[in-house]
């Protein structure tokens, strides 16, 4: 099964809210890296570098993203099919951010769950998992 990583997960992995969360996230990440096909939508890469880069700096944020990619996660480009599906999803849910619609479209194209605690995915009919 494929899992699509959301920006919220990558940020939680980089900046765990607590020591306990750090341990749970590390166990979860090790498990999914071994057992699952991991996909990072290109929009997640953009958001991650923007958010993490403000705290770590650009070079460190890109390096951390590359750790995921060099460990086997795939970067999913914004294809024509994904763009059209994301547009269709966002037509019905104007309250959902465009980035979440793109991430949802990637998940749908792969029949995958999204690793996120963001309820916007529920509104789009996307199943989610979280590290807890």
Identify the meaning behind each predicted range.
Residues 1-40, 53-66:
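Short, well-structured N-terminal submotif of metal-dependent ribonuclease cores
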Residues 2, 75, 104-132:
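Acidic, PIN/NYN-like endoribonuclease modules and their adjacent C-terminal/linker elements
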Residues 6, 100, 118:
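Acidic active-site catalytic centers that drive phospho-/nucleotidyl reactions
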Residues 12-14, 51, 86, 124:
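Residues that scaffold the ATP/ADP-binding catalytic core of kinase and kinase-like folds
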Residues 23-40, 48, 53, 84, ...:
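A generic "structured core" feature
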Residues 32-33, 69, 108, 122:
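Anion (oxyanion) recognition and catalysis
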Residues 74-115:
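Active-site neighborhoods of divalent-metal-dependent phosphate/nucleic-acid chemistry enzymes
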């Amino acid at each position: 099964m494929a899992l699509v990583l959301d920006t919220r997960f990558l940020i939680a992995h980089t900046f765990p809210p607590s020591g306990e969360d750090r341990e749970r996230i590390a166990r979860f990440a090790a498990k999914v890296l071994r057992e699952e096909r991991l996909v990072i939508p290109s929009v997640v890469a953009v958001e991650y570098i923007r958010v993490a880069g403000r705290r770590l700096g650009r070079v460190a944020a890109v390096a951390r993203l590359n750790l995921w990619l060099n460990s086997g996660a795939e970067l999913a480009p914004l294809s024509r099919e994904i763009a059209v599906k994301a547009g269709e999803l966002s037509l019905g849910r104007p309250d959902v951010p465009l980035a979440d619609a793109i991430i949802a479209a990637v998940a749908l194209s792969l029949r995958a769950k999204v690793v996120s605690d963001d309820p916007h995915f529920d509104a789009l009919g996307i199943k989610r998992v979280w590290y807890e």
